Amino acid sequence: MANLKAIRDRIKSVRNTRKITEAMRLVAAAKVRRAQEQVLSTRPFADRLAQVLAGLQQRLQFENVDLPLLQRREVKTVALLVVSGDRGLCGGYNSNVIRRAEQRARELSAQGLDYKFVIVGRKAGQYFQRREQPIEATYSGLEQIPTAQEANDIADELLSLFLSGTVDRVELVYTKFLSLVASNPVVQTLLPLDPQGLASSDDEIFRLTTRGGSFTVEREKLTSEVAPLPRDMIFEQDPAQILSALLPLYLSNQLLRALQEAAASELAARMTAMNSASDNANALVGQLTLVYNKARQAAITQELLEVVAGAEALNG
């Protein structure tokens, strides 16, 4: 009987765990929807900013303008901005982006370049601190759905490092959202800004929907028709000054989009991990129930045999 009680307790424990994992899956799904809405809400601003930058570039294309954020210089030190999460229970999300950052650091070292880390997320921060890697700044405790203010704070740190000459290039290592079951850690250059890519407005958005009782993601390619600025538009300030002021804003916007995509990847990974955990819990409950029924049947059979044996002994 003691064995039966232990199995019952184990079944109860697994069922309680399943309730937790299922709740976490639903919470992650709700936050993915919120992240989707936030991405869509920032698109009009991003499109208008791209329009203004494209117009200013066209006005200044034949002028010799000194814009530090566009200048490429000899690279000696690279800042690696690594975007990870603060929490676990999200499959291989954190380990994959950390592995990609380590790989990029080795590539830079092989080229004879120094590197510094700027870390977003507690998991990557703890990992690189334990290995005594050069960390310039760490950001943790961010909202699960990143805000513009958080992106601005990180962008200010990167601008300070780049403009002061502490680093000559800033690279971003983050997880690109592909689907609920697939993501890809990628590396892209943030600074210096690419003048050819300032007006790029093509984008992909994702929509979390339900189909057949399960969650699925629909991707949509958006192409914004950015109209050129009127040729007779008069700027009160010098166009070069306006462009110089807007470039940091463009950097913050690009960083915000990357943070949002990384957050969507983390939430999707957590959804997948919790869904797998719930499925495993269901399977384990089934196995334990089968073991319990067999043990209970064996106990009943044993009791019947004992009763029969006792009756035969009395009759004999």
Curated annotation (Swiss-Prot):
Membrane topology, as annotated: Peripheral membrane protein
Quaternary context: F-type ATPases have 2 components, CF(1) - the catalytic core - and CF(0) - the membrane proton channel. CF(1) has five subunits: alpha(3), beta(3), gamma(1), delta(1), epsilon(1). CF(0) has three main subunits: a, b and c.
Name of the protein this chain belongs to: ATP synthase gamma chain
Keywords, in A-Z order: ATP synthesis, CF(1), Hydrogen ion transport, Ion transport, Membrane, Thylakoid, Transport
Cited InterPro entries: ATP_synth_F1_ATPase_gsu, ATP_synth_F1_gsu, ATP_synth_F1_gsu_CS
Pfam family, one: ATP-synt
GO MF: ATP binding; proton-transporting ATP synthase activity, rotational mechanism
Keyword Methyltransferase among UniProt keywords: no
Family annotation (SUPFAM superfamilies): ATP synthase (F1-ATPase), gamma subunit (SSF52943)
Family per record: Belongs to the ATPase gamma chain family.
Domain of life according to the entry: Bacteria
